[in-house]
């Protein structure tokens, strides 16, 4: 979460008159994050999160994102719930931006996730996939295989200034992925960005997921692969198989992977690493110093890409056979 658009108390008060959430007592910006402007609101009725959607978020996608949160909450998944305005809408306008209010989720994200946290996230992700199975809306993943080559072409010319040989490495990975990407795996609603800062905990207990603004309809096992990349590598870029096994055990205890999904995990994990390397690389090369967008080091994901090239079976990620459906 972050703050790119400032608001004052007068315009906020006018905006809040469209909601039945009590009287505003205080508000403050939330500094973390990269995509939208977020504020923590305290009112006489409780705490809420106000989000102003910045230019990177397509307004046409907002009904999907907010509708998904509403749907998942009704299915018992812990996540922020959109607050409906007095006119029945979930989206308003504030400071020239589309804006929405969601409920406040208790907990904090884990900067050093443990094995227990990884298992809980895997289990929670599987519950999310099942809860989203009957969500009627669809949204194409705008950052999947067909999008990677065009995104890469925007950075390709300067990529070797980040790391010598990165052009050749990335070209080889994209060639491999385009030839081997699975076509017929189970699809549904995925989070697509379930990094540690998007999962809240109270102690070791998962209290819920946040930030559904990359959610889309895509391969379910790809979401698992994103999590393996996001949760199971240490600061020295080594893969923690114990954490991987815990995450996969948690997931498959709720939703076992098919044999085809298990066999595709290598390709999906490699693809997930490429996806996040490419977006980081683009920002690294194009976002000017002092910009509100927080640049993240693409080399963290180059190192993951190199790891995945050496993997020969899903067992090396920690997948146990009892987690694979017969």
Curated annotation (Swiss-Prot):
Its EC number is 2.7.1.39. One of its GO terms (molecular function) is ATP binding. Keywords: Amino-acid biosynthesis, ATP-binding, Kinase, Nucleotide-binding, Threonine biosynthesis, Transferase. The keyword DNA damage does not apply. InterPro entries: Aminoglycoside_PTrfase (IPR002575), Homoserine_kinase_II (IPR005280), Kinase-like_dom_sf (IPR011009), Pseudomonas-type_ThrB (IPR050249). Pathway: Amino-acid biosynthesis; L-threonine biosynthesis; L-threonine from L-aspartate: step 4/5. GO terms for biological process: threonine biosynthetic process. It is an enzyme of class 2 (transferase). It catalyses: L-homoserine + ATP = O-phospho-L-homoserine + ADP + H(+). Belongs to the pseudomonas-type ThrB family. NCBIfam families: PRK05231.1, thrB_alt. This is Homoserine kinase. The gene is thrB.
């Amino acid at each position: 979460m972050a703050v790119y658009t400032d608001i004052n108390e007068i315009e906020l008060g006018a905006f809040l008159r469209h909601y039945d959430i009590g009287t505003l007592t205080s508000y403050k910006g939330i500094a973390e994050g990269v995509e939208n402007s977020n504020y923590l609101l305290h009112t006489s009725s409780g705490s809420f999160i106000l989000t102003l959607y910045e230019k990177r978020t397509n307004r046409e996608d907002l009904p999907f994102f907010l509708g998904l949160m509403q749907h998942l909450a009704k299915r018992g998944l812990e996540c922020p719930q959109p607050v409906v305005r007095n006119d029945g809408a979930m989206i308003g306008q504030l400071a020239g931006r589309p804006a929405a209010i969601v409920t406040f989720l208790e907990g904090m994200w884990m900067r050093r996730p443990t094995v227990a946290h990884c298992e809980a996230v895997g289990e929670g992700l599987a519950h999310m996939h099942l809860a989203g199975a009957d969500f009627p809306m669809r949204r194409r993943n705008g950052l999947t295989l067909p999008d990677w080559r065009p995104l890469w072409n925007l950075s390709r010319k300067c990529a070797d200034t980040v790391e010598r040989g990165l052009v050749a490495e990335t070209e080889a990975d994209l060639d491999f992925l385009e030839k081997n990407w699975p076509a017929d795996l189970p699809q549904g609603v995925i989070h697509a960005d379930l990094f540690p800062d998007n999962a809240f905990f109270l102690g070791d207990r998962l209290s819920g997921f946040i930030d559904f603004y990359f959610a889309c309809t895509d391969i379910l096992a790809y979401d698992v692969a994103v999590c393996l990349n996001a949760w199971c590598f240490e600061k020295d870029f080594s893969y923690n198989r114990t954490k991987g096994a815990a995450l996969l055990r948690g997931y498959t205890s709720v939703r076992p992977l098919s044999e085809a999904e298990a066999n595709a995990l290598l390709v999906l994990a490699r693809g997930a690493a490429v996806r996040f390397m490419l977006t980081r690389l683009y920002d690294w090369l194009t976002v000017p110093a002092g910009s509100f967008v927080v640049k993240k080091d693409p080399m963290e994901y180059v190192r993951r890409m190199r790891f995945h090239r050496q993997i020969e079976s899903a067992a090396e990620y920690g997948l146990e056979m009892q987690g694979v459906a017969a």
